[in-house]
Amino acid sequence: MANTKKSAINQVVTRDYTIHMHKRLYGVSFKKRAPRAIKEIVAFAQKHMQTKEVRVDPSLNKEVWKRGIRNVPHRLRLRLSRKRSDEDDKALYTYVQAVDVANPKMETTVVEE
């Protein structure tokens, strides 16, 4: 019998994640750490939200770069929102924002808006 469930990939959803940047940037030379961090965040969003297009919020970019190119935060709390594109109703994209928390070592949660 065929699977009759609808795929959850096409739904609009928002989730909070904690991403361990130190694990992803270990061994990267100093002058490439912050640019690589942005690339790793985009790859993380593509993998977890299963969209090709990822848009990074300017506040997240400032959060990554606030201590310079070398000293990227060890952990970041991210809010990933899968949204519908304005041009094409079927196209989905992921919008990545930084979440300001005192302790970023929290669990992944689903955000109700």
UniProtKB/Swiss-Prot annotation:
It comes from the Eukaryota. Keywords: Cytoplasm, Ribonucleoprotein, Ribosomal protein. GO terms for biological process: cytoplasmic translation. Gene3D superfamilies: 3.10.440.10. The keyword Cell cycle does not apply. PROSITE patterns: RIBOSOMAL_L31E (PS01144). The keyword Disulfide bond does not apply. GO terms for molecular function: structural constituent of ribosome. Its main location: cytoplasm. GO terms for cellular component: cytosol; cytosolic large ribosomal subunit; preribosome. It is found in: Cytoplasm. Component of the ribosome, a large ribonucleoprotein complex responsible for the synthesis of proteins in the cell. The small ribosomal subunit (SSU) binds messenger RNAs (mRNAs) and translates the encoded message by selecting cognate aminoacyl-transfer RNA (tRNA) molecules. The large subunit (LSU) contains the ribosomal catalytic site termed the peptidyl transferase center (PTC), which catalyzes the formation of peptide bonds, thereby polymerizing the amino acids delivered by tRNAs into a polypeptide chain. Belongs to the eukaryotic ribosomal protein eL31 family. Component of the large ribosomal subunit (LSU). Mature yeast ribosomes consist of a small (40S) and a large (60S) subunit. The 40S small subunit contains 1 molecule of ribosomal RNA (18S rRNA) and at least 33 different proteins. The large 60S subunit contains 3 rRNA molecules (25S, 5.8S and 5S rRNA) and at least 46 different proteins. This is Large ribosomal subunit protein eL31.
